[in-house]
Design a protein with these regions (language model features):
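Bacterial N-terminal signal peptides
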Residues: 6-16
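Conserved loop-alpha-helix segment in the C-terminal half of the alpha/beta-hydrolase fold
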Residues: 203-229, 235, 248
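Conserved strand-to-loop "acid loop" that flanks and positions the catalytic carboxylate
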Residues: 110, 198-205
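Active-site catalytic motif of lipid deacylating hydrolases and related acyltransferases
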Residues: 24-84
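Flexible "cap/lid" loop of the alpha/beta hydrolase fold
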Residues: 106-107, 111-152, 156, 179-182, ...
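Gly/Ala-rich beta-loop-alpha elbow adjacent to hydrolase catalytic centers
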Residues: 89-94, 98
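Active-site glycine-rich loops that stabilize anionic/oxyanionic intermediates
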Residues: 36-39, 92-93, 116
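Active-site nucleophile elbow and catalytic-triad environment of alpha/beta-hydrolase enzymes
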Residues: 170-192, 203
Length: 259
């Protein structure tokens, strides 16, 4: 067993003990994690053990990334399988998905991780036009079937620039091609208007402008933390992200927003 692995193991274990011991008892036990574009459920691999050690039941969906409606339907199925109230967590494009799927009655809280948070009637392409294009956007390439991928250069320099190089290259190699049509899907409900929200701003994000993330968080009146992270804080700062999700599980489930 390598020294690097042992260091990571004990660091994650210590973080889990800290999270589990911190604060009030859990009000919600179920957490559904929704990945973003060019990713899959394994993007939560560093957060899941921390949440489980805190006593939470975790499901990470595997969305097809074929359309917003397909991804919402997949996420709703995961929500329906839970045995009680749910905290719904979305990363990046996954914020579009949880904004729509979050209207499900079982969902009692929403956590956005460097994620889009549209209003009803908006598509991803409608968001952020008032800000300069993020650098990583220039590294997105379409294929002949209309699916999008990020170049290896884009992943290394703009998607996950604060991860070890080996992890960055794995993300580039395993990314899920995303149908461009998914970015044109409009949400019909903005669940964040009715349910408690939390937001992780990634201040070094090069895929979504950090100021746009701050704008989303402010519009939702979300409990917000800001991390000096790339676009993937759940991989570069898993302890901080897990701690916020645990907070949501402890504080959700008793009221709707504004009550």
């Amino acid at each position: 067993m390598s020294a690097r692995f042992l260091t990571l193991f004990f660091a994650l274990g210590f973080s889990a003990l800290t999270i589990a011991a911190d604060g009030d008892a859990m009000r919600v036990r179920n957490v559904v994690l929704v990945h973003g574009a060019w990713a899959d459920g394994s993007s939560w691999a560093k957060v899941i053990p921390l949440l489980e050690k805190a006593g939470l039941n975790i499901v990470a969906v595997q969305n097809p990334l074929t359309s917003l409606s397909d991804d919402v339907a997949t996420t709703k199925r995961a929500i329906a399988l839970q045995d009680g109230p749910v905290i719904l967590v979305g990363h990046s494009y996954g914020g579009m998905v949880i904004t729509e799927a979050g209207a499900e009655p079982k969902v009692v809280g929403l956590v956005y991780v460097a994620a889009f948070a549209p209003d009803a009637g908006q598509a991803l392409g409608d968001l952020g036009k008032e800000f300069p294009p993020p650098p990583g956007g220039a590294e997105v390439r379409p294929d002949s079937a209309g699916f999008l991928k990020i170049t290896t250069k884009g992943v290394v320099e703009s998607f996950a620039q604060d991860l070890p190089m080996q992890e960055r290259r794995v993300l580039a190699a395993t990314q899920g091609p995303t149908n461009a049509a998914a970015f044109g899907g409009k949400v019909t409900n903005a669940a964040w208007k009715a349910k408690p929200t939390w937001y992780v701003v990634a201040s070094n994000d090069r895929m979504i402008q950090p100021d746009l993330e701050r704008k989303f968080a402010e519009a939702m009146n979300a409990k917000t933390i800001e991390l000096p992270s790339s676009h993937v804080p759940m991989l570069s700062r898993p302890g901080d992200v897990a701690k916020l999700i645990v907070e949501a599980a402890k504080k959700s489930g008793t009221s709707v927003k504004g009550k």
